[in-house]
């Protein structure tokens, strides 16, 4: 949907289980979107790579190995790698998982989330836990809406990184980028 409607030029689809990932890959191939959507086996955000920030002036490389396993818990980020690299995605979309799992993924991926602009999450349970986790990690909830899927209602939450509040790289407002 995101690629087909020009909302997102590139998507990284990740899942911890091979079966759902294989089915997703088949749907992507059938839709002719393999050039735009990459799939990876991943526990949370662990398979999301770090890329060198545009304009970085050398220094420590952004190979991902340097940061692997570190956990950010609200303190100031340390090290040249963190200042000169970013995760390969600027938006995280999570749907179809419970709130406890969503909160765990957010907590375990906190260092990458520190450099991402937007989180969209549709937890199937424990909304308060997800809201508190987003808040603790420096995200402000900007919108919530009910979504009906297969006869069930779910809450979709749009949250923005307060450290990057207000604009995209081109200076445009992020408010128009996602309509939940």
Specify the residue positions occupied by each region the protein language model found.
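Conserved SAM-binding loop of SAM-dependent methyltransferases across substrates and taxa
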Residues: 1-8
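Conserved SAM-binding motif I beta-strand of class I
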Residues: 10-15
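Conserved SAM/SAH-binding beta-strand->alpha-helix loop
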Residues: 17-19
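Class I S-adenosyl-L-methionine
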Residues: 100-180
């Amino acid at each position: 949907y995101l690629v087909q409607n020009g909302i997102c030029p590139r998507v990284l689809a990740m899942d911890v289980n091979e079966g759902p990932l294989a089915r997703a890959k088949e749907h992507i191939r059938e839709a002719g979107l393999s050039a735009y959507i990459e799939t990876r086996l991943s526990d949370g955000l662990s398979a999301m790579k770090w890329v060198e920030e545009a304009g970085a002036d050398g220094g420590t490389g952004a190979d991902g190995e340097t940061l692997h396993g570190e956990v950010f818990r609200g303190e100031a980020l340390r090290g040249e790698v963190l200042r000169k690299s970013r995760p390969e995605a600027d938006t995280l979309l999570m749907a179809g998982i419970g709130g406890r799992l969503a909160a765990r993924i957010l907590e375990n991926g906190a260092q990458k989330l520190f450099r991402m602009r937007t989180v969209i999450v549709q937890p199937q349970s424990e909304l308060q836990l997800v809201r508190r986790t987003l808040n603790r990690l420096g995200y402000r909830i900007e919108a919530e809406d009910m979504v009906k899927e297969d006869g069930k209602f779910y809450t979709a939450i749009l949250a923005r990184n307060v450290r990057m509040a207000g604009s995209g790289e081109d200076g445009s407002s992020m408010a128009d980028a996602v309509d939940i």
